[in-house]
């Protein structure tokens, strides 16, 4: 498995992209190796388990959750993954196959407290809420504490709010950018593979951009040079996001200019998107992904320029403090969406908080 995987890594490296996330078959082989690891491969195997398997309800996540559950139930063992680490790794899987095991552990003398700490930060519990509520009704103090934590919105308040001042470097594309510029239809076959698909972003010649391979690969050199400045990148355009492929277009932009998501391979969130005009459905999709997205005049903002964004004051300045643009947020809720790592996360989290307050244990 390791030989095949390293061969895959080398192939992807030649393409300038990271390896694909592990699928269920590779994850099954990884689980076998974790129980009897080849000498010297321990750290590598643990990294694969921690960072290269999609969370949630992916088939590979099912295999991962099953293995970690077996560890905590004494049905499997590994010299690399002990029980406390298994609980921590289950907690990092966002929601889905991990939740039931964490709830079961609330009755475990040794691991209950650690499991509760993980559950406090998971909002994707859905109907499993009732399982925790039932334990609380039966007198389980940790179950009560989890529901109180959700009621207090600790899942939200533990995250950093949007800063009052953000220093960023600009990547600006003049004119209209439609979703086909960001996610070309003729490259639709690669959309599930976000890093590979993103290479086609802006692959056609246009003012200010130098595609690496016109018609095939976009301006990777220019993007790399901007990112090497070491600041957050503000993606800026005159008109941004017209067209229908808003999800894959957003994925492409954020692959280059967003933030890595812990434990989620090959997908980014966050980022900054500014447009004189932004298509509503693209705007909404950026919100879903946790981007700080807003409309503002951009004629005084140029590629390579270092700017300071004052989100609450509604202004953008250059480094000397000269005002380049003034704006108004569509809604102050966008600050909560960014803090929650996305609009969908905020909606789900708020719903959980409301349910918890209805049965809150004080």
Question: Can you say where each PLM-predicted feature lies in the sequence?
Answer:
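Eukaryotic acidic, Ser/Thr-rich intrinsically disordered low-complexity regions
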Residues: 2-5, 126-156
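Amphipathic alpha-helical scaffolding segments comprising HEAT/armadillo-like alpha-solenoid repeats
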Residues: 24-32, 55-74, 94-107, 124-136
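Conserved phosphate/anionic-ligand binding catalytic regions in large, soluble enzymes, centered on
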Residues: 177-183, 239-252, 333, 337-348
């Amino acid at each position: 498995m390791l030989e095949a995987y390293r061969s895959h890594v080398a192939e992807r490296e030649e393409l300038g992209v990271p390896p694909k996330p592990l699928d269920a078959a590779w994850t099954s082989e990884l689980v076998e190796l974790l129980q009897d690891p080849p000498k010297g491969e321990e750290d590598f195997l643990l990294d694969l388990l921690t960072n290269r398997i999609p969370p949630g309800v992916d088939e590979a996540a099912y295999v991962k959750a099953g293995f970690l559950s077996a560890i905590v139930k004494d049905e499997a063992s590994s010299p690399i993954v002990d029980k406390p680490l298994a609980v921590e790794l289950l907690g990092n899987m966002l929601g889905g196959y991990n939740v039931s095991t964490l709830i079961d552990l609330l009755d475990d003398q040794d691991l209950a407290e650690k499991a509760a700490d993980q559950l406090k930060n998971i909002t994707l519990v859905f109907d499993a809420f009732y399982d925790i509520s039932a334990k609380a009704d039966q007198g389980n103090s940790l179950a009560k504490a989890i529901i109180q934590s959700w009621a207090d919105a600790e899942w939200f308040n533990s995250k950093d709010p949007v800063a009052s001042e953000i220093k960023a470097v600009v990547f600006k594309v003049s004119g209209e950018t439609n979703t086909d510029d960001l996610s070309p239809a003729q490259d639709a076959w690669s959309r599930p593979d976000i890093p590979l698909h993103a290479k086609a972003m802006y692959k056609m010649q246009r003012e200010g951009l130098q595609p690496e391979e016109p018609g095939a690969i976009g301006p990777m050199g220019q993007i790399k040079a901007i990112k090497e400045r070491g600041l957050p990148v503000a993606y800026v355009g005159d008109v941004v996001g017209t067209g229908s492929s808003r999800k894959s277009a957003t994925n492409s932009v954020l692959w280059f200019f967003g933030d890595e998501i812990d434990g989620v391979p090959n997908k980014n969130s966050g980022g900054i998107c500014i447009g004189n005009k932004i298509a509503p459905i693209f705007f909404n999709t950026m919100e879903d992904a946790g981007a700080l997205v807003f409309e503002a005049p951009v004629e005084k903002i140029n590629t390579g320029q270092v700017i300071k964004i004052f989100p609450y004051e509604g202004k953008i300045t250059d480094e000397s403090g000269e005002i380049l643009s003034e704006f108004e947020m569509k809604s102050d809720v966008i600050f909560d969406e960014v803090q929650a790592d996305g609009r969908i996360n905020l909606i789900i989290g708020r719903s959980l908080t409301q349910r918890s307050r209805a049965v809150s244990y004080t």
